[in-house]
Structures are given as C-alpha cells and as structure tokens.
C-alpha cells in the first residue's frame, strides 16, 4: 500500500468495519493493531436492526445471522424484586417493521468475519504488533508513528483503538 491509503489505528470490530466500508467505496486502507496477534476475545454483544443493516452492507450480515441468538423480548427488570418494569417484544412484527432482527452474538464471531473480509481484500492491509503512538497532520496527509517501526504516511487517520487510545488522547 502507498501514501494514498487511509490509516486506521485499531484492529477491533470498529477498525475492521471501517476498513471494510472504505474498501466497499474503493479506498485503500492500512489497519494498525497493537496486539501481537488477532485472537478471539470478548463476550456477547447485542445487535439491533441497524447493526444488521451495516453488517449486510459490509458483506458479513449472513455470518452475523448464522451466529446470532435471537431473543423474544427486551426486558427491563427491577433489580430487587426481579419483576418486569417494561418489556419490548422482538417478534416477527418487530422484525417486519424494522427490516432486521434484534439478536445477541459473540464478539469474536463478528471480529473473525470482519478480519476474514479484510485479509481477503486487495484494498486492505492488516498489520499486527503496530502500536500507534502519535500522529502528525501535514496539509493533506497524515503521518502515523508506530512503536519500533517506521512511520506510515496516509491520506487520513481513523482512531479506532478504544478508550485508552494514544490517538484518541492526542485528538
């Protein structure tokens, strides 16, 4: 990849989804992940209809549906009595109205689906063991400084490293 790439700091679901979305629009990207390997971590996440719509656009909607556990309702319960305070049915009527289901899926399943997409795309380069330390904006370009590696130049930078991000702190 060259300096016409969009740089993405963070190889989690957000960073990989950003890379996949950019590839859908024909943009090259370089994903820089601090971890020495991309492994299955995390727990369950809730996916609303809008998330399924996004995953469909990114080409991993079928994977989301295949790995999802569909729930009948969302329940807000009193912590002391355990009684329902409110209940939102998530049945066929909900799915028809929203165009997609509401479900729960393991984070690792979605991460793997997005990672597979990114690895198989000629527009995306994924680099592990690349801790983004800081960046510099230079006119129409950005330079990303990686710990123990040469800096990487690109058109723009997306910070997707999470709450303890060096890039987030600098921005």
Sequence positions of predicted segments:
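Glycine-rich FAD pyrophosphate-binding loop
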Residues: 23-43
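N-terminal Rossmann-fold NAD(P) dinucleotide-binding loop
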Residues: 15-16
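Conserved N-terminal helical subregion
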Residues: 2-6, 23, 52-171
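Conserved N-terminal glycine-rich FAD pyrophosphate-binding loop of Rossmann-like flavoproteins
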Residues: 36-56
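Conserved N-terminal Rossmann-fold NAD(P)-binding element of oxidoreductases
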Residues: 9-10
């Amino acid at each position: 990849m060259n300096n016409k790439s969009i740089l993405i700091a963070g190889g989690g679901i957000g960073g990989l989804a950003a890379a996949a979305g950019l590839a859908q629009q024909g943009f090259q990207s370089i994903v820089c992940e601090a971890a020495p390997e991309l492994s299955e971590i995390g727990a369950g996440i809730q996916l609303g209809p809008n998330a399924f719509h996004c995953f469909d656009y990114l080409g991993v909607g079928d994977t989301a549906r295949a790995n999802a556990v569909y729930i009948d309702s969302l329940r807000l319960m009193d912590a002391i009595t355990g009684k329902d305070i409110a209940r939102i049915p998530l049945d066929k009527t909900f799915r028809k109205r929203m165009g997609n289901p509401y479900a729960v899926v393991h984070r690792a399943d979605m991460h793997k689906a997005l990672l597979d997409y990114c690895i198989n795309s000629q527009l995306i380069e994924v680099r592990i063991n690349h801790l983004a330390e800081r960046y510099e904006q230079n006119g129409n370009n950005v330079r990303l400084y990686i710990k123990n590696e040469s800096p990487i130049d690109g058109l723009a930078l997306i910070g997707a490293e999470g709450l303890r991000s060096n890039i987030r702190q600098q921005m």
